[in-house]
Curated annotation (Swiss-Prot):
Role noted for this protein: Methylates the class 1 translation termination release factors RF1/PrfA and RF2/PrfB on the glutamine residue of the universally conserved GGQ motif.
GO biological process, one term: methylation
Catalytic activity: L-glutaminyl-[peptide chain release factor] + S-adenosyl-L-methionine = N(5)-methyl-L-glutaminyl-[peptide chain release factor] + S-adenosyl-L-homocysteine + H(+)
UniProt keywords, alphabetically: Methyltransferase, S-adenosyl-L-methionine, Transferase
Protein name as annotated: Release factor glutamine methyltransferase
Enzyme Commission number: 2.1.1.297
Gene: prmC
A GO molecular-function annotation: protein-glutamine N-methyltransferase activity
Residues annotated as binding substrate: N187, P188, P189, Y190
Family indicated by similarity: Belongs to the protein N5-glutamine methyltransferase family. PrmC subfamily.
Cited Gene3D superfamilies: DNA helicase RuvA subunit, C-terminal domain (1.10.8.10), Vaccinia Virus protein VP39 (3.40.50.150)
Keyword presence, Transit peptide: no
Ligand binding (S-adenosyl-L-methionine): G120, T121, G122, S123, G124, D143, F172, N187
Keyword Magnesium belongs to the record: no
Length: 283
């Protein structure tokens, strides 16, 4: 079987499994199985599919058609133009979260020194992106999962950022006690518990701890908003990813804390609520 023939059959299987972009994902998985970049793969479609690569490829195609995430199969995801290792121990970084990182970068000067924290770092995508684009920043990243921190550590080493990013095990803010931060960023779990069973199969494959936001999806914000106020310097920036219908609710929670000013909600690329921003009030 040639690579072209394998690609055609893979597209058919993925489409039958409900994959939205079967051609693109088939090309990605075939390139991964053959250790070829996509352009090189497309230039060699008349070559035969090697037996070793075929075994890896068809197993991956069948798992993807059954709803297993593409990124867990390849072990990679691009975020903020950086390549991150991902495993089933971490949430897969998404384009929506880039809105949060970009909002922080727009408000901080890359020539200045900052102390920043990322709570619930997972793969380290937010923390490491901020460290990459803010070369004088010192970043602290927390996660309760040792397995997630192992992935984040590998990404920090691969990106050459391990010297400026400190990984701390613990629940959200607990490892940050005693620090004074210029910015605190988090993508907390915000999906209501009752909505979890209705999520697509690939999303349900991700860590429940990173998804389940409690009965109304707001549990993490009730904890983070008052806690962050005690860590941020006066004028410090708080940036949180939020669910698409949670903007007003998170604003109300922040205002009830009484420690913030200039609360605002920014949309994602589809125009939905995605990022809550506020500044710590000056004393």
């Amino acid at each position: 079987m040639t690579l072209r023939q394998a690609l055609g059959e893979a597209v058919r299987r993925l489409a039958a499994g409900g994959v939205e972009r079967p051609r693109l994902e088939a090309e990605v998985l075939l390139g991964w199985a053959c250790s070829l970049t996509r352009p090189r793969l497309l230039a060699r479609l008349e070559e035969e599919l090697a037996p070793a690569a075929a075994g890896r490829f068809w197993q991956a195609i069948d798992r993807r058609a059954a709803g297993y995430p593409l990124q867990y199969l390849t072990g990679h995801q691009e975020f903020m133009s950086l390549d991150f290792k991902v495993t089933p121990a971490v949430l897969i970084p998404r384009q929506d979260t880039e809105v949060v990182v970009e909002a922080v970068l727009e408000r901080l000067d890359p020539c200045e020194s900052y102390t920043i924290a990322d709570c619930g770092t997972g793969s380290g995508a937010i923390a490491l992106s901020l460290a990459h684009y803010l070369p004088r920043a010192r970043v602290y990243a927390t996660d309760i999962s040792p397995a997630a921190l192992t992935v984040a550590q590998e990404n920090a080493r691969k990106l050459g950022l391990a010297a400026r990013v400190t990984l701390l095990q613990g629940d959200f803010l607990a490892p940050l006690r005693g620090l004074k931060l210029d910015a605190l960023v988090a993508n907390p779990p915000y999906i209501p518990t009752a909505a979890l069973p209705g999520l697509p199969a690939d999303v349900r494959s991700e860590p429940r701890l990173a998804l389940d936001g409690g009965p109304d999806g707001l549990d993490a914000y009730r904890f983070l908003l008052p806690g962050a106020a005690g860590l941020l310097r006066p004028g410090g920036l708080l940036a949180l990813e939020i669910g698409s219908d949670q903007g007003q609710a998170v604003k109300d929670l922040a205002r009830a804390v009484g420690a913030y000013r200039n609360e605002q909600v920014l949309p994602d690329y589809a125009g939905r609520d995605r990022c809550f921003l506020a500044y710590r009030r000056e004393e």
